[in-house]
Every structure is written in structure tokens, then in C-alpha cells.
Regions:
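Short helices/loops that flank or line small-molecule/ion binding pockets
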Residues: 71-83, 127, 161-182, 189
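Periplasmic-binding protein-like
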Residues: 29-31, 107-112, 188-227, 246-256
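Bilobed "Venus flytrap"/periplasmic-binding protein-like clamshell domains
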Residues: 30, 42-54, 116-150, 156, ...
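Extended ligand-binding regions for polar small-molecule ligands
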Residues: 46-58, 118-121, 126-127, 131-132, ...
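Ligand-binding clefts/hinges and TM-proximal coupling segments of bilobed small-molecule sensing domains
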Residues: 62, 140-155, 159, 227-256
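Acidic, polar ligand-binding/catalytic clefts
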Residues: 65-127, 137, 141, 198-201
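Extracytoplasmic small-molecule ligand-binding "clamshell" domains
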Residues: 19-98, 135, 157-158, 222, ...
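Short beta-strand-to-loop elements that line the ligand-binding cleft
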Residues: 62-69, 152-167, 199
Length: 256
């Protein structure tokens, strides 16, 4: 009888432990503010951090963050070492293998061709030839991939979004690619005559979260939480903390 009681206690303890397993999120080490601030290899603030924190809290789960190089994020997801990747687009992971659920789009990322104040004339990306373009190591730029493959343009990879803009600022190259949020954050304390300028829109990409389908992960509950965050205006309120906007209308999310 005592053995049966002990077995029951152990089973209950195992069930509680399973329910309390943390929700494991990936953080790309190349990200920068306002997306995320990383201190001592852990995120501490930023748009994506706030979204993930709220997502886990509403699911009554603790959040665990794995900071990894962007090139390894997909592999980490496929291996089951993380449960959720936020700030993701299907076009960035065309060869993803496994069973996953995608959220509705939460934000619209606008990628810009960026230059310095002395070279701020609007420029069609297709007109660029024999240019070195500042890029982030491991980032995919679908609209410019043919130009890179054909060597019409050359990548100059830096390890983070901030480093790309810093190298542009000191004229290591004439053009770089960055998103509107990172550009605005980088420029926020610069005098007007020193602010980097967007000279063309490269791409506009809906981004959301992807959750690994596993019996231990409440994927559908997480999808409902993200939908509620979007429709209630919580995503927009998070964006406003960082003086920016999601790019999606608050009352009518874009289709997945």
C-alpha cells in the first residue's frame, strides 16, 4: 500500500514538473535594440523580449532564453532545443524540417537600403552594381539574393545590426541593409546632419512566432494568446514603449 502511495506521489510530482517546464525561446545574438537588449548573454528589454515575456506569463509558464548565433537558430529549433522562435518569417526558413505552428503576423519588418547623409539621394536597388553592401552575418535578404549570387553586389557581413550601421557611419561602404526600427533607434540621439538615411525600401515582411508541435508544449494555447495580444492592442502598446509602431492595423491583422 505504501508503495502504491509513493508511486502516486511520484507520478503527481512528475506531472507538476512537466507542467512547470519553462518555455524555451531563441534569441539571435545579432539582434539589437529596439528588438532586444542583451546583457551577460541574456535578454533584458526590447520589443521581442517584452512580447515573449508576456506570452509566457499569460500561459502561466516561466520563460527561458537561449542566445545563439542566427545561423544556428533554425538548427536549434529542429533539434528540439528550443520551443518557440519569435520574430520569424517563413521566407527566412524555406528548408525548415519538422512539425510547427505559425502564429498570425505580429509585426511588419521594413528592410531599407541605408546610406549616409552625404549620399542620401533615393536609389532603386536594381540600379546598384559593383557595390559592397553592409549586411548581417547569417541574415537572408530574399529580394537581393540574385544580385549577391550573380556578384552584381557583394556582402560585407558584420556580426550584429548595430555593427552594420556603425561601419556605414564611418564609410566602410556606401550602402547597408537594415530594418526601419533599428535605423530609427540608431539615429535617435544623433544630430539631424549625422543621421543615416533610408534611400529605398528593400522588402516588407510580416513576422510572427513559430512554435514546435510537441505534446509538452501548449502550441494552440500560445497561438490564442498571441492572437489576443494582437487584437487587444497589447502588441501596439509594447511597440509604443520604444517609440515605434508594428506596421499592422490594430483592428485587422494581416492573414498568416
Amino acid at each position: 500500500m505504501r508503495l502504491l502511495a509513493l508511486s502516486a506521489v511520484m507520478l503527481m510530482s512528475g506531472s507538476v514538473a512537466a507542467e512547470e517546464a519553462p518555455l524555451r525561446f531563441s534569441i539571435a545574438d545579432a539582434w539589437a535594440m529596439p528588438l532586444v537588449q542583451i546583457d551577460d548573454h541574456q535578454p533584458t528589454s526590447g520589443i521581442i523580449f517584452d512580447i515573449m515575456q508576456s506570452m509566457a506569463a499569460q500561459a502561466n509558464l516561466s520563460a527561458e532564453y537561449r542566445v545563439v548565433p542566427i545561423q544556428r537558430v533554425q538548427r536549434t529549433l529542429e533539434r528540439g532545443a528550443i520551443d518557440v522562435r519569435c520574430y520569424a518569417a517563413q521566407s527566412w526558413m524555406p528548408n525548415l524540417s519538422g512539425d510547427y505552428t505559425w502564429s498570425l503576423p505580429l509585426l511588419i519588418q521594413r528592410d531599407l537600403l541605408i546610406s549616409t547623409p552625404d549620399n542620401a539621394t533615393p536609389r532603386a536597388p536594381a540600379s546598384l552594381t559593383n557595390e559592397t553592401i553592409g549586411t548581417v552575418l547569417g541574415y537572408v535578404y530574399p529580394t537581393l539574393q540574385n544580385a549577391f549570387d550573380n556578384r552584381q553586389l557583394r556582402r560585407d557581413d558584420a556580426r550584429s545590426e548595430v555593427q552594420v550601421l556603425q561601419k556605414l557611419q564611418i564609410h566602410r561602404y556606401r550602402y547597408a541593409i537594415g530594418n526601419q526600427w533599428s535605423l530609427d533607434w540608431f539615429n535617435r540621439n544623433l544630430p539631424d546632419d549625422q543621421k543615416l538615411r533610408g534611400v529605398a525600401v528593400i522588402d516588407e515582411q510580416p513576422v510572427g512566432c513559430i512554435v514546435r508541435n510537441d505534446t509538452d508544449i501548449p502550441a494552440q494555447r500560445l497561438m490564442r494568446i498571441l492572437l489576443r495580444m494582437r487584437m487587444s492592442g497589447e502588441i501596439d502598446r509594447i511597440m509604443s514603449r520604444y517609440n515605434t509602431v508594428s506596421g499592422l492595423p490594430a483592428d485587422r491583422p494581416a492573414a498568416p
